[in-house]
Protein backbone atom coordinates (compact mmCIF):
# COMPACT_ATOMS: atom_id res chain seq x y z
CA UNK A 1 0.00 0.00 0.00
CA UNK A 2 1.22 3.53 -0.80
CA UNK A 3 2.94 5.43 2.02
CA UNK A 4 0.52 8.37 1.61
CA UNK A 5 -2.45 6.02 2.12
CA UNK A 6 -0.83 4.48 5.23
CA UNK A 7 -0.31 7.98 6.68
CA UNK A 8 -3.93 8.87 6.01
CA UNK A 9 -5.10 5.68 7.75
CA UNK A 10 -2.83 6.34 10.75
CA UNK A 11 -4.36 9.82 11.02
CA UNK A 12 -7.87 8.33 11.03
CA UNK A 13 -6.82 5.83 13.72
CA UNK A 14 -5.57 8.71 15.90
CA UNK A 15 -8.75 10.68 15.30
CA UNK A 16 -10.83 7.63 16.24
CA UNK A 17 -9.03 7.43 19.61
CA UNK A 18 -9.54 11.19 20.16
CA UNK A 19 -13.27 10.91 19.44
CA UNK A 20 -13.58 7.90 21.76
CA UNK A 21 -11.95 9.90 24.58
CA UNK A 22 -14.19 12.92 23.92
CA UNK A 23 -17.33 10.74 24.05
CA UNK A 24 -16.57 9.84 27.66
CA UNK A 25 -15.96 13.50 28.63
CA UNK A 26 -18.71 14.79 30.97
CA UNK A 27 -18.84 18.24 29.30
CA UNK A 28 -19.41 16.61 25.89
CA UNK A 29 -22.07 14.23 27.24
CA UNK A 30 -24.03 17.21 28.59
CA UNK A 31 -23.90 18.97 25.17
CA UNK A 32 -26.37 16.89 23.14
CA UNK A 33 -25.55 18.44 19.74
CA UNK A 34 -21.79 17.94 20.15
CA UNK A 35 -22.30 14.43 21.54
CA UNK A 36 -24.54 13.52 18.59
CA UNK A 37 -22.03 14.90 16.05
CA UNK A 38 -19.12 13.01 17.64
CA UNK A 39 -21.15 9.78 17.87
CA UNK A 40 -21.89 10.10 14.15
CA UNK A 41 -18.19 10.69 13.37
CA UNK A 42 -17.21 7.67 15.50
CA UNK A 43 -19.70 5.47 13.62
CA UNK A 44 -18.33 6.71 10.26
CA UNK A 45 -14.74 5.90 11.31
CA UNK A 46 -15.59 2.46 12.69
CA UNK A 47 -15.30 0.37 9.50
CA UNK A 48 -12.09 1.97 8.23
CA UNK A 49 -10.42 1.70 11.67
CA UNK A 50 -11.44 -1.95 11.99
CA UNK A 51 -10.11 -2.64 8.48
CA UNK A 52 -6.80 -0.84 9.13
CA UNK A 53 -6.24 -2.73 12.41
CA UNK A 54 -6.81 -6.00 10.54
CA UNK A 55 -4.34 -4.79 7.87
CA UNK A 56 -1.72 -3.97 10.53
CA UNK A 57 -2.22 -7.44 12.05
CA UNK A 58 -1.74 -9.07 8.62
CA UNK A 59 1.52 -7.08 8.14
CA UNK A 60 2.74 -8.30 11.57
CA UNK A 61 1.76 -11.91 10.71
CA UNK A 62 3.71 -11.68 7.45
CA UNK A 63 6.84 -10.45 9.25
CA UNK A 64 6.57 -13.25 11.85
CA UNK A 65 6.17 -15.85 9.10
CA UNK A 66 9.22 -14.49 7.23
CA UNK A 67 11.28 -14.83 10.42
CA UNK A 68 10.10 -18.45 10.75
CA UNK A 69 11.60 -19.16 7.31
CA UNK A 70 15.05 -18.71 8.88
CA UNK A 71 14.43 -21.77 11.10
CA UNK A 72 16.17 -25.08 10.27
CA UNK A 73 13.11 -27.22 11.01
CA UNK A 74 11.52 -28.25 7.63
CA UNK A 75 8.06 -28.46 9.22
CA UNK A 76 8.34 -24.90 10.55
CA UNK A 77 9.53 -23.71 7.13
CA UNK A 78 6.54 -25.34 5.45
CA UNK A 79 4.21 -23.78 8.02
CA UNK A 80 5.87 -20.38 7.46
CA UNK A 81 5.30 -20.62 3.70
CA UNK A 82 1.60 -21.31 4.31
CA UNK A 83 1.44 -18.36 6.74
CA UNK A 84 3.11 -16.07 4.18
CA UNK A 85 0.66 -17.14 1.47
CA UNK A 86 -2.32 -16.55 3.80
CA UNK A 87 -1.03 -13.16 5.06
CA UNK A 88 -0.39 -11.92 1.49
CA UNK A 89 -3.93 -12.90 0.45
CA UNK A 90 -5.34 -11.09 3.51
CA UNK A 91 -3.27 -7.98 2.74
CA UNK A 92 -4.49 -7.90 -0.86
CA UNK A 93 -8.14 -8.25 0.20
CA UNK A 94 -7.87 -5.70 3.03
CA UNK A 95 -6.06 -3.18 0.81
CA UNK A 96 -8.91 -3.35 -1.74
CA UNK A 97 -11.51 -2.96 1.03
CA UNK A 98 -9.67 0.00 2.58
CA UNK A 99 -9.38 1.76 -0.79
CA UNK A 100 -13.17 1.62 -1.13
CA UNK A 101 -13.67 2.80 2.48
CA UNK A 102 -11.39 5.78 1.77
CA UNK A 103 -13.31 6.88 -1.33
CA UNK A 104 -14.88 10.34 -1.02
CA UNK A 105 -18.33 9.94 0.53
CA UNK A 106 -21.43 11.52 -0.94
CA UNK A 107 -22.63 13.59 2.05
CA UNK A 108 -26.21 13.08 0.90
CA UNK A 109 -26.08 9.26 1.08
CA UNK A 110 -27.37 9.32 4.66
CA UNK A 111 -30.31 11.59 3.75
CA UNK A 112 -33.98 10.71 3.36
CA UNK A 113 -35.30 10.91 -0.20
CA UNK A 114 -38.27 11.94 -2.28
CA UNK A 115 -39.09 9.40 -4.99
CA UNK A 116 -41.09 10.81 -7.91
CA UNK A 117 -42.63 8.33 -10.36
CA UNK A 118 -44.35 9.60 -13.51
CA UNK A 119 -46.20 7.64 -16.17
CA UNK A 120 -44.75 8.32 -19.62
CA UNK A 121 -45.60 6.82 -23.01
CA UNK A 122 -48.19 4.06 -22.88
CA UNK A 123 -51.34 5.67 -21.45
CA UNK A 124 -53.25 3.55 -18.92
CA UNK A 125 -50.63 0.79 -19.01
CA UNK A 126 -47.88 3.31 -18.11
CA UNK A 127 -49.94 4.51 -15.12
CA UNK A 128 -50.48 0.90 -13.97
CA UNK A 129 -46.72 0.29 -14.27
CA UNK A 130 -46.03 3.47 -12.24
CA UNK A 131 -48.19 1.89 -9.52
CA UNK A 132 -46.19 -1.34 -9.80
CA UNK A 133 -42.92 0.57 -9.42
CA UNK A 134 -44.21 2.42 -6.37
CA UNK A 135 -45.27 -0.89 -4.83
CA UNK A 136 -41.82 -2.36 -5.65
CA UNK A 137 -40.01 0.50 -3.89
CA UNK A 138 -42.44 0.33 -0.94
CA UNK A 139 -41.76 -3.40 -0.55
CA UNK A 140 -38.02 -2.74 -0.70
CA UNK A 141 -38.47 -0.04 1.96
CA UNK A 142 -40.10 -2.64 4.24
CA UNK A 143 -37.01 -4.87 3.97
CA UNK A 144 -34.84 -1.87 4.91
CA UNK A 145 -37.17 -0.82 7.78
CA UNK A 146 -37.79 2.56 6.16
CA UNK A 147 -40.95 4.63 6.44
CA UNK A 148 -42.89 5.61 3.29
CA UNK A 149 -45.21 8.60 3.19
CA UNK A 150 -47.11 9.66 0.06
CA UNK A 151 -46.66 13.41 -0.47
CA UNK A 152 -48.75 13.77 -3.60
CA UNK A 153 -50.60 11.34 -5.87
CA UNK A 154 -52.50 11.69 -9.13
CA UNK A 155 -54.19 8.34 -9.71
CA UNK A 156 -54.71 6.72 -13.11
CA UNK A 157 -58.25 6.06 -14.31
CA UNK A 158 -57.64 2.30 -14.52
CA UNK A 159 -55.31 1.96 -11.54
CA UNK A 160 -51.79 3.00 -10.73
CA UNK A 161 -50.63 6.60 -10.90
CA UNK A 162 -50.14 9.29 -13.50
CA UNK A 163 -47.74 10.72 -10.92
CA UNK A 164 -46.84 9.84 -7.35
CA UNK A 165 -44.33 11.52 -5.04
CA UNK A 166 -43.37 9.80 -1.79
CA UNK A 167 -40.94 10.51 1.03
CA UNK A 168 -38.77 7.56 2.07
CA UNK A 169 -37.13 7.99 5.48
CA UNK A 170 -34.65 5.80 7.33
CA UNK A 171 -31.01 4.76 7.20
CA UNK A 172 -29.01 5.52 4.01
CA UNK A 173 -32.15 5.97 1.89
CA UNK A 174 -30.65 8.25 -0.75
CA UNK A 175 -27.41 6.24 -0.88
CA UNK A 176 -29.36 3.12 -1.85
CA UNK A 177 -32.01 4.64 -4.12
CA UNK A 178 -30.09 7.37 -5.98
CA UNK A 179 -29.22 5.04 -8.88
CA UNK A 180 -32.94 4.47 -9.59
CA UNK A 181 -33.33 7.85 -11.34
CA UNK A 182 -34.02 7.60 -15.07
CA UNK A 183 -36.36 5.95 -17.57
CA UNK A 184 -37.91 2.57 -16.69
CA UNK A 185 -39.44 0.62 -19.59
CA UNK A 186 -41.92 -2.25 -19.29
CA UNK A 187 -42.77 -4.87 -21.91
CA UNK A 188 -45.85 -6.98 -21.18
CA UNK A 189 -49.31 -7.98 -22.40
CA UNK A 190 -51.90 -5.59 -20.91
CA UNK A 191 -54.98 -7.16 -19.30
CA UNK A 192 -57.16 -5.36 -21.86
CA UNK A 193 -55.19 -6.81 -24.82
CA UNK A 194 -57.28 -9.58 -26.43
CA UNK A 195 -54.72 -10.52 -29.11
CA UNK A 196 -51.96 -11.28 -26.61
CA UNK A 197 -49.62 -8.67 -28.09
CA UNK A 198 -46.77 -7.33 -25.99
CA UNK A 199 -46.99 -3.57 -25.41
CA UNK A 200 -44.13 -1.29 -24.41
CA UNK A 201 -44.72 1.57 -21.99
CA UNK A 202 -42.48 3.72 -19.86
CA UNK A 203 -42.20 5.62 -16.60
CA UNK A 204 -39.62 8.02 -15.26
CA UNK A 205 -38.25 7.91 -11.74
CA UNK A 206 -36.47 10.82 -10.05
CA UNK A 207 -34.85 10.35 -6.64
CA UNK A 208 -34.09 13.59 -4.78
CA UNK A 209 -32.32 13.80 -1.44
CA UNK A 210 -34.21 15.63 1.30
CA UNK A 211 -32.52 18.92 2.18
CA UNK A 212 -32.20 19.82 5.89
CA UNK A 213 -33.65 23.26 6.67
CA UNK A 214 -30.25 24.61 7.67
CA UNK A 215 -28.80 23.70 4.25
CA UNK A 216 -31.80 24.57 2.07
CA UNK A 217 -31.32 26.81 -0.95
CA UNK A 218 -32.70 30.26 -0.28
CA UNK A 219 -35.99 30.91 -2.02
CA UNK A 220 -37.29 34.44 -2.33
CA UNK A 221 -41.05 34.38 -1.55
CA UNK A 222 -41.59 36.91 -4.35
CA UNK A 223 -40.35 34.25 -6.82
CA UNK A 224 -43.19 31.89 -5.87
CA UNK A 225 -46.74 31.73 -7.16
CA UNK A 226 -49.00 29.78 -4.80
CA UNK A 227 -52.38 28.57 -6.06
CA UNK A 228 -55.03 26.71 -4.09
CA UNK A 229 -57.53 24.33 -5.67
CA UNK A 230 -59.89 21.55 -4.75
CA UNK A 231 -58.25 18.13 -4.43
CA UNK A 232 -59.43 15.53 -6.94
CA UNK A 233 -59.28 11.76 -6.97
CA UNK A 234 -59.12 9.18 -9.77
CA UNK A 235 -61.18 10.15 -12.81
CA UNK A 236 -61.13 13.80 -11.77
CA UNK A 237 -63.92 13.75 -9.17
CA UNK A 238 -63.49 16.20 -6.30
CA UNK A 239 -62.85 14.44 -3.02
CA UNK A 240 -63.38 17.33 -0.61
CA UNK A 241 -65.23 20.59 -0.58
CA UNK A 242 -62.42 22.94 0.51
CA UNK A 243 -59.57 24.34 -1.56
CA UNK A 244 -56.93 22.50 0.49
CA UNK A 245 -54.72 21.40 -2.43
CA UNK A 246 -51.67 23.56 -3.15
CA UNK A 247 -49.74 24.27 -6.33
CA UNK A 248 -46.43 26.14 -5.96
CA UNK A 249 -44.66 27.52 -9.03
CA UNK A 250 -41.05 28.68 -8.78
CA UNK A 251 -41.17 31.44 -11.39
CA UNK A 252 -37.43 31.70 -12.27
CA UNK A 253 -37.16 27.99 -13.16
CA UNK A 254 -40.77 27.13 -13.99
CA UNK A 255 -40.65 24.27 -11.46
CA UNK A 256 -44.17 23.29 -10.36
CA UNK A 257 -45.05 21.18 -7.31
CA UNK A 258 -48.57 20.13 -6.36
CA UNK A 259 -49.65 18.58 -3.08
CA UNK A 260 -53.19 17.51 -2.31
CA UNK A 261 -52.84 14.47 -0.09
CA UNK A 262 -53.61 16.18 3.23
CA UNK A 263 -56.91 17.83 4.18
CA UNK A 264 -55.01 20.75 5.72
CA UNK A 265 -53.87 23.49 3.34
CA UNK A 266 -51.03 24.35 5.74
CA UNK A 267 -49.71 20.76 5.70
CA UNK A 268 -49.98 20.54 1.91
CA UNK A 269 -48.03 23.80 1.56
CA UNK A 270 -45.26 22.57 3.91
CA UNK A 271 -44.99 19.30 1.99
CA UNK A 272 -44.96 21.03 -1.40
CA UNK A 273 -42.21 23.40 -0.21
CA UNK A 274 -40.02 20.49 0.98
CA UNK A 275 -40.35 18.82 -2.45
CA UNK A 276 -39.67 22.13 -4.25
CA UNK A 277 -36.49 22.69 -2.21
CA UNK A 278 -35.34 19.13 -3.01
CA UNK A 279 -35.96 19.68 -6.74
CA UNK A 280 -34.10 22.99 -6.84
CA UNK A 281 -31.20 21.45 -4.88
CA UNK A 282 -31.15 18.48 -7.29
CA UNK A 283 -30.90 20.90 -10.24
CA UNK A 284 -27.93 22.61 -8.53
CA UNK A 285 -26.32 19.21 -7.83
CA UNK A 286 -26.77 18.18 -11.47
CA UNK A 287 -25.09 21.41 -12.68
CA UNK A 288 -22.17 20.80 -10.33
CA UNK A 289 -21.84 17.14 -11.37
CA UNK A 290 -21.85 18.09 -15.06
CA UNK A 291 -19.06 20.61 -14.45
CA UNK A 292 -16.99 18.17 -12.36
CA UNK A 293 -17.45 14.98 -14.33
CA UNK A 294 -17.37 15.85 -18.02
CA UNK A 295 -14.87 13.06 -18.62
CA UNK A 296 -16.40 10.51 -16.27
CA UNK A 297 -19.70 8.72 -16.78
CA UNK A 298 -22.33 9.45 -14.20
CA UNK A 299 -24.33 6.46 -12.98
CA UNK A 300 -26.61 8.65 -10.85
CA UNK A 301 -29.40 9.43 -13.29
CA UNK A 302 -31.12 12.76 -13.64
CA UNK A 303 -34.64 11.36 -13.97
CA UNK A 304 -34.73 12.40 -17.64
CA UNK A 305 -37.14 10.23 -19.66
CA UNK A 306 -34.65 9.98 -22.54
CA UNK A 307 -32.16 8.30 -20.21
CA UNK A 308 -33.45 4.72 -20.20
CA UNK A 309 -31.79 2.81 -17.40
CA UNK A 310 -33.83 -0.38 -17.04
CA UNK A 311 -36.22 -2.69 -18.91
CA UNK A 312 -38.72 -5.05 -17.25
CA UNK A 313 -39.74 -7.79 -19.71
CA UNK A 314 -42.64 -9.78 -18.24
CA UNK A 315 -43.03 -12.51 -20.94
CA UNK A 316 -39.36 -13.47 -20.43
CA UNK A 317 -39.31 -12.82 -16.66
CA UNK A 318 -36.28 -10.62 -17.32
CA UNK A 319 -35.01 -7.32 -15.91
CA UNK A 320 -32.04 -5.56 -17.54
CA UNK A 321 -29.97 -2.61 -16.34
CA UNK A 322 -28.60 -0.96 -19.48
CA UNK A 323 -25.93 1.11 -17.70
CA UNK A 324 -23.88 -1.89 -16.60
CA UNK A 325 -25.16 -4.56 -19.05
CA UNK A 326 -26.73 -6.58 -16.23
CA UNK A 327 -29.58 -9.00 -16.96
CA UNK A 328 -31.40 -11.03 -14.30
CA UNK A 329 -34.12 -13.63 -14.87
CA UNK A 330 -35.86 -13.00 -11.56
CA UNK A 331 -38.42 -10.34 -12.42
CA UNK A 332 -41.06 -11.57 -9.94
CA UNK A 333 -38.66 -11.25 -7.01
CA UNK A 334 -37.58 -7.77 -8.16
CA UNK A 335 -41.19 -6.56 -8.45
CA UNK A 336 -41.76 -7.88 -4.91
CA UNK A 337 -39.03 -5.56 -3.64
CA UNK A 338 -35.89 -7.73 -3.87
CA UNK A 339 -33.80 -4.88 -5.30
CA UNK A 340 -30.41 -5.64 -3.76
CA UNK A 341 -29.45 -7.81 -6.76
CA UNK A 342 -29.82 -4.67 -8.92
CA UNK A 343 -28.61 -2.02 -6.47
CA UNK A 344 -25.40 -3.71 -5.25
CA UNK A 345 -23.80 -4.27 -8.71
CA UNK A 346 -24.35 -0.64 -9.72
CA UNK A 347 -22.95 0.62 -6.40
CA UNK A 348 -19.85 -1.55 -7.02
CA UNK A 349 -19.56 -0.20 -10.58
CA UNK A 350 -19.80 3.35 -9.22
CA UNK A 351 -17.04 2.59 -6.68
CA UNK A 352 -14.86 1.16 -9.47
CA UNK A 353 -15.35 4.39 -11.46
CA UNK A 354 -14.38 6.47 -8.41
CA UNK A 355 -11.26 4.33 -7.84
CA UNK A 356 -10.26 4.72 -11.50
CA UNK A 357 -10.74 8.50 -11.28
CA UNK A 358 -8.68 8.60 -8.07
CA UNK A 359 -5.89 6.61 -9.73
CA UNK A 360 -5.89 9.06 -12.68
CA UNK A 361 -5.65 12.03 -10.29
CA UNK A 362 -2.75 10.44 -8.41
CA UNK A 363 -0.96 10.00 -11.72
UniProtKB/Swiss-Prot annotation:
Key words, A-Z: Cytoplasm, Methylation, Protein biosynthesis
Main location group: cytoplasm
Function: Peptide chain release factor 1 directs the termination of translation in response to the peptide chain termination codons UAG and UAA.
PANTHER family: LD18447P
PTM summary: Methylated by PrmC. Methylation increases the termination efficiency of RF1.
Subcellular location: Cytoplasm
Organism: Shewanella amazonensis (strain ATCC BAA-1098 / SB2B)
InterPro entries: PCRF, Pep_chain_release_fac_I, Pep_chain_release_fac_I_sf, Prokaryotic/Mito_RF, RF-1
Gene: prfA
Positions bearing N5-methylglutamine: 237
Protein's UniProt name: Peptide chain release factor 1
NCBIfam families: prfA, PRK00591.1
SMART domains to which the protein is assigned, alphabetical: PCRF
Disordered, as annotated region: 286-305
GO CC annotation terms, alphabetical: cytoplasm
UniProt xrefs under HAMAP family: Rel_fac_1 (MF_00093)
GO molecular function: translation release factor activity, codon specific
Ranges of Basic and acidic residues composition bias in the record: 286-295
Family statement: Belongs to the prokaryotic/mitochondrial release factor family.
Amino acid sequence: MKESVIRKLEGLLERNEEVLALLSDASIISDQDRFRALSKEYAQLEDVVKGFKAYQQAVADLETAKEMLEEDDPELKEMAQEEIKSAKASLERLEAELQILLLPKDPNDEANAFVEIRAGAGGDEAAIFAGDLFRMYSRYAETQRWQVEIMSANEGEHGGYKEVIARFSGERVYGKLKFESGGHRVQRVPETESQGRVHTSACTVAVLHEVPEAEAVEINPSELRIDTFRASGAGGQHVNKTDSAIRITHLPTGTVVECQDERSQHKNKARAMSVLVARLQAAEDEKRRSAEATTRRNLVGSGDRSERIRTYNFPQGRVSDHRINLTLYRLNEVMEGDLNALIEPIVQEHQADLLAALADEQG
